[in-house]
């Protein structure tokens, strides 16, 4: 009986020893698995930290990119507005250039017309001056003739009948010469009025020509400025 009891106890001991070894093995495996899991957790935490850092970096870069995009959009709108303003300014300058060209062409026409009128008036003035000189010479000639007749009347000693007859003749001659003198004086006066009128017309045309020249110069200066502004764009 004692031997049988010992065997039973020994079997139980062996069984317990086996179970203990299995338990220790299981515990050791569990510890190893725990350590492995801890390492995996640590790696995952480190990877998460790196992921969070990358996420933070990506978020910051995204914010910077968003700000850059906003700034780029603002710059684009500014450039677009500047471009629109430049196009509008160019259109205005082109219209001003067209108007200035038309004004310059009109000024050229007026300048040519004024120069032509001035040339014609100068010719008329020369002719009038020539007529005035001729009329004045004729007046002097008639005055000399009248003086000669008067002197001859005083120096002649003739009979009363002859004197009377010649007096009538002389009176007729004097009347004729007086009338011719009056006509010549009238023509001279008319010629003087014509010359004065033509001189006023010449003065007016010269003033008009000067004004057209000044206006033409102003238009030319404006054209030069417009071309310079267009060249700047």
From Swiss-Prot:
In terms of PROSITE patterns, this protein maps to: TROPOMYOSIN (PS00326)
List every stretch annotated Disordered: 48-88
- What InterPro entries does the record point to? Tropomyosin
* Compositionally biased spans, kind Basic and acidic residues: 51-79
Is-annotated flag, keyword Repeat?
Answer: yes
Taking the record's annotation, the residue ranges forming a coiled coil are 6-222
In its keyword annotation, does this UniProt entry include Coiled coil?
Answer: yes
A Pfam match: Tropomyosin
Q: Name one GO molecular function term.
A: protein homodimerization activity
**UniProt keyword list:** Allergen, Coiled coil, Muscle protein, Repeat
Domain notes, please?
The molecule is in a coiled coil structure that is formed by 2 polypeptide chains. The sequence exhibits a prominent seven-residues periodicity.
Query: Which family is it part of?
Result: Belongs to the tropomyosin family.
As for what it does, the entry says: Tropomyosin, in association with the troponin complex, plays a central role in the calcium dependent regulation of muscle contraction.
Descriptive protein name: Tropomyosin
């Amino acid at each position: 009986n004692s031997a049988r009891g010992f065997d039973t106890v020994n079997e139980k001991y062996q069984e317990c020893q086996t179970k203990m070894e299995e338990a220790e093995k299981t515990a050791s495996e569990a510890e190893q698995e725990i350590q492995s899991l801890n390492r995996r957790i640590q790696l995952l935490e480190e990877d998460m930290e790196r992921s969070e850092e990358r996420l933070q970096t990506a978020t910051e870069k995204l914010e910077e990119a968003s700000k850059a995009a906003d700034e780029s959009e603002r710059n684009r709108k500014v450039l677009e507005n500047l471009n629109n303003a430049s196009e509008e300014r160019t259109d205005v300058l082109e219209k001003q250039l067209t108007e200035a060209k038309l004004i310059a062409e009109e000024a050229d026409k007026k300048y040519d017309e004024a120069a032509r009128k001035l040339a014609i008036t100068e010719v008329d003035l020369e002719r009038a001056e020539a007529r005035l000189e001729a009329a004045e010479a004729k007046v002097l000639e008639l005055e000399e003739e009248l003086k000669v007749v008067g002197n001859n009347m005083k120096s002649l000693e003739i009979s009363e009948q002859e004197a009377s007859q010649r007096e009538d003749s002389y009176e007729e001659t004097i009347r004729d010469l007086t009338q011719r003198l009056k006509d010549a004086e009238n023509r001279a006066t008319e010629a003087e009025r014509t010359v004065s009128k033509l001189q006023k017309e010449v003065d007016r045309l010269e003033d008009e020509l000067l004004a057209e020249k000044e206006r033409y110069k102003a238009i030319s200066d404006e054209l030069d400025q417009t071309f310079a502004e267009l060249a700047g764009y």
